[in-house]
């Protein structure tokens, strides 16, 4: 990301000689202890890289024999450089291939698009590394990857196991010169064992406990220039080999970042406060060289690094960022489900694996996860903004996925036959068997349908909206089931039909087999009562109503709430399988519409929200409240933003929230801050959960996009809906269109893991799919994979070459060992790393019914990949 021009003051004249190398730990000739520095470049063709950058790096490496660089250049950049500047490209590849240069250049961030990582799915993180490393090896065949480091706060708690599985040995948690979007918590000394949620640990250079944020700055720490203050504080804290860092923006023309000067004299008055003078002597290193040759090598501390140690903030609720997050989430969900369907089609029907189209779909999804899309969405080049690119990139991913998925379902379903009936195939891309309400479009001329399962038994049905027809489907894990629909309407009975009634006091009561719920139009259509019938009739609503919209409309008199104006309520569907209630109200003169959906047997209560803004209006903290305070930003404090609030009946509640391949028990007393130097991690990736102090009951809140949540003492659980006001770099985040989003509520007993909350979120993100054919024939039901325990998730299915790779994530289950049942034959199977290295072969076993299974154990939050060699359909099918 482009820094502001005043940063150039640190860039002195080029061409001066650098400090000669000093032996590890030895004093320089003048007696000063040497410090170390990580220099290099950050950027790429999508971020910023000028035509001369490649040749510039080569020339400067030759000009300064003691200079070393660490690279964070977008891998796809090398395609363009090779095509447009072949001589420069050849010169650079020559440098990397030169044994004499092998310790002077290290590629420290090979991800495809330099994503923040904390804001995307775990599987997306895996593919960021996979595709990025693959691209770099196309250009630099002998390249190795030892250390992960980033100039931006591109960190997430689960990285240790992923990095180790890809063959990395080290990491750095510093980003001293680009902290606009945040930083990691200051902790520890020279080296720590960064310990992830699964127990994996990685040798890591942290942001030291003494590495403070730079005074009067909103983007730096005192390590960005190896300041005298930073190094002397580090030495006094017992850090024997202190190291600073700055990966310069590609395009900065100053060459080596820290310029030579006089050696520091220990004990100089004011040395611990001198943040402007670079410490001397400073020795340049790569991260690998520093850790292996300069540092203490063996960490003295173990750090159980959590997601709340990633102190980051973006303009959550800003409409442009909200749309980007939604578009990315849609594409993430689509591509994972599409790969699974394609794998089924390849194994069961012999369809070719669509590797090239899926690679292209992943490419554009990964680009849409670029950190600049999220932090500077309005920045543009040739009239095209990052936000515009996300629309284009995710659109491409979605088109490819829709085409591949449709083809796969078509191959699996079969076609042809009589036209007086239709074949309805229902596909499940998750690891659990499902019994859910699904819908399909009635054929032309049909007004109703009778649906039968593969054994000819009628199943419960219901008319949906328009030409949609609903029925209750039972589908095996990672597979599909077949149903037949005929003209007519003779539905099977429902044991406890869902329904809505309007009561004498004007409220609406919704009854399903799961819930009894009351909506009050007089209070803006909010939920007054929420009783979970199968949870000992627990009442979840507190004294105040659930689902109230509230925010500070600072141009319209301050705080407003949706309860100020009565709502119009209309019943859209009234059972027996599904009920839908439309709620239309107003907040601060802006009309909104909510669609409340409850389904028989479904734990989740779905809410779709539309806000039809007539014009841009300020929402959030008033600009006047932060004017004159450079560290303060109006978008930091979520309590002023428009939120959906859920005051529950719990006393002293606890909060849990998920992250990529992780769930965190929050230790925040509240989520509120208003200044750059006090950032908290309040990111809601997929869900946040509030439970009572005893862990007896809880309410999960799901979001259709990465955003923020609110919570605190005397402040209810809240979902950020909208912000309109000043953002980063002085940009105004405005409202330009209607706001449309989905969220869901899941009341539950026990803590999040006992309630299977991660699994519920996966079911929401990967809904059952239907494919309809007139007539036709197909196997009644198939299951490609089944796991004999709850809480294990199939993160992905891919079919590179002749092998099927099955990635499994232990989201909320026991460590095992557990049984994994493949629904296909295979030659052999092994456990492999993300890098493709065989860890060990697995021995198939048979259960008492003669079914093949594999035993697999992994810790909570562990990720494992099974590779099935030459899988094929069972011979007896």
Where on the chain are the PLM-derived regions?
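Bacterial Sec-dependent N-terminal signal peptides
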Residues: 1-28
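C-terminal (or distal) subdomains of carbohydrate-active enzymes
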Residues: 8, 159-162, 398, 406, ...
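N-terminal catalytic cores of secreted or lumenal carbohydrate-active enzymes
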Residues: 22-127, 136-139, 165-169, 310, ...
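Active-site and substrate-binding clefts of carbohydrate-active enzymes
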Residues: 29-47, 188-418, 427-429, 454, ...
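Alpha-helical scaffolding within the catalytic cores
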Residues: 52-56, 83-100, 128, 179-198, ...
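Alpha-helical scaffold elements lining the catalytic groove of polysaccharide deacetylases
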Residues: 116-138, 208-234, 579
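CE4/NodB-like, metal-dependent polysaccharide N-deacetylase domain
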Residues: 125-165, 226-246
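Catalytic domains of cell-wall/extracellular-matrix polysaccharide-remodeling enzymes
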Residues: 140-187, 252-262
């Amino acid at each position: 990301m482009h820094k502001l021009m005043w940063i150039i003051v640190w860039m002195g004249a080029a061409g001066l000689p650098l400090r000669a190398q000093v032996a590890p730990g030895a004093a320089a000739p003048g007696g000063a202890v040497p410090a170390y520095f990580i220099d290099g470049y950050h950027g790429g063709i999508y971020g910023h890289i000028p035509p001369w950058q490649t040749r510039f790096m080569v020339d400067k490496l030759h000009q300064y024999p003691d200079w070393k660089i660490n690279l964070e250049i977008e891998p796809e950049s090398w395609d363009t450089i090779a095509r447009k500047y072949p001589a420069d490209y050849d010169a650079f590849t020559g440098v990397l291939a030169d044994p004499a240069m092998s310790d002077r250049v290290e590629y420290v961030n090979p991800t495809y698009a330099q994503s923040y990582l904390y804001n995307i799915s775990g599987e997306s993180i895996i593919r960021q590394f996979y595709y990025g490393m693959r691209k770099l090896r196309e250009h630099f065949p002998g390249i190795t990857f030892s250390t992960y480091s980033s100039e931006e706060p591109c960190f997430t708690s689960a990285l240790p196991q992923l990095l180790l599985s890809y063959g990395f040995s080290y990491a750095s948690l510093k980003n001293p010169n680009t902290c606009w979007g945040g930083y990691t918590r200051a902790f520890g000394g020279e080296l720590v064992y960064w310990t992830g949620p699964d127990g994996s640990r990685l040798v890591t250079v942290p942001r030291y406990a003494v590495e403070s944020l730079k005074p009067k700055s909103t983007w730096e720490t005192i390590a960005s220039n190896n300041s005298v203050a930073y190094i002397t504080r580090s030495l006094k804290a017992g850090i024997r080999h202190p190291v600073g860092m700055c990966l310069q923006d590609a395009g900065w023309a100053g060459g080596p970042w820290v310029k030579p000067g006089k050696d520091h004299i220990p004990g100089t008055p004011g040395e611990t406060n001198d943040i402007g003078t670079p410490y001397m002597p400073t020795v340049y290193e790569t991260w690998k060289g520093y850790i292996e040759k300069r540092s203490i090598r063996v960490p003295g501390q173990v750090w159980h690094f959590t997601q709340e140690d990633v102190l980051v903030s973006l303009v959550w609720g800003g409409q442009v960022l909200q749309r980007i997050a939604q578009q990315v989430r849609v594409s993430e969900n689509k591509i994972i489900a599409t790969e699974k369907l394609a794998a089924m089609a390849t194994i069961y029907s012999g369809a070719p694996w669509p590797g090239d189209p899926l690679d292209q779909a992943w490419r554009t999804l990964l680009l849409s996860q670029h950190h600049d899309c999220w932090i500077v969405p309005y920045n543009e080049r040739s009239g095209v903004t990052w936000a515009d690119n996300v629309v284009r990139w995710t659109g491409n991913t979605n088109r490819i996925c829709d085409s591949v998925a449709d083809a796969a379902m078509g191959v699996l379903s079969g076609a042809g036959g009589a036209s007086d009936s239709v074949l309805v195939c229902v596909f499940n891309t998750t690891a659990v068997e499902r019994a859910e309400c699904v819908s399909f479009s009635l054929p032309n001329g049909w007004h109703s349908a009778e649906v039968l399962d593969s054994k000819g038994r009628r199943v419960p049905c219901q008319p949906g909206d328009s030409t949609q027809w609903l029925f209750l489907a039972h589908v095996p894990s990672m597979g599909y089931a077949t149903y037949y629909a005929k003209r007519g309407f003779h539905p099977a009975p429902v044991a406890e039909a869902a329904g809505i009634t309007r009561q004498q006091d004007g409220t609406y009561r919704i009854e399903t087999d799961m819930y009894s719920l009351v909506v009050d139009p007089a209070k803006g259509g909010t939920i007054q009562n929420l009783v979970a019938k199968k949870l000992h009739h627990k009442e979840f609503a507190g004294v105040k109503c659930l689902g109230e919209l509230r925010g500070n409309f600072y141009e319209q008199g301050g705080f407003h709430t949706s309860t100020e104006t009565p709502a119009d309520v209309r019943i859209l569907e009234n059972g027996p399988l599904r009920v839908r209630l439309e709620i239309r109200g107003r907040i601060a003169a802006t009309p909104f519409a909510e669609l409340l959906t409850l389904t028989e047997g479904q734990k989740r209560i779905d809410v779709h929200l539309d806000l039809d803004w007539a014009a841009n209006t300020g929402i959030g903290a008033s600009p006047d409240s932060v004017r004159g305070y450079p560290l303060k930003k109006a978008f930091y404090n979520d309590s002023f933003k428009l939120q959906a609030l859920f005051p529950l009946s719990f006393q002293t509640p606890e909060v849990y929230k998920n992250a990529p391949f992780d769930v965190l028990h929050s230790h925040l007393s509240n989520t509120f801050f208003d200044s750059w130097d006090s950032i908290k991690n309040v990111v809601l990736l997929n869900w946040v959960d509030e439970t009572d102090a005893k862990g007896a009951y809880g309410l999960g809140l799901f979001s259709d996009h990465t955003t923020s949540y609110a919570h605190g003492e005397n402040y209810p659980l809240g979902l950020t809906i909208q912000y309109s006001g000043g953002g980063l770099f002085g940009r105004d985040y405005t409202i330009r269109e209607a706001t449309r989003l989905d969220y869901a509520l899941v009341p539950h007993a026990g803590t999040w893991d006992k309630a299977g909350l991660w699994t519920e979120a996966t079911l929401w993100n990967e809904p059952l799919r239907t494919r309809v054919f007139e007539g036709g024939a197909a196997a009644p039901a198939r299951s490609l994979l089944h796991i004999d325990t709850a809480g294990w998730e199939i993160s992905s299915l891919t079919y590179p070459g002749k092998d099927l790779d099955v990635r499994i994530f232990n989201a909320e289950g026991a460590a095992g060992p557990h049984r994994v049942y493949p629904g296909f034959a295979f030659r052999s199977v092994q456990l492999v790393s993300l890098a493709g290295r065989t860890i060990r072969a697995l021995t198939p076993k048979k259960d008492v019914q003669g079914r093949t299974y594999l035993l697999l154990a992994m810790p909570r939050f562990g990720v494992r990949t099974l590779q099935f060699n030459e899988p094929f359909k069972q011979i007896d099918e």
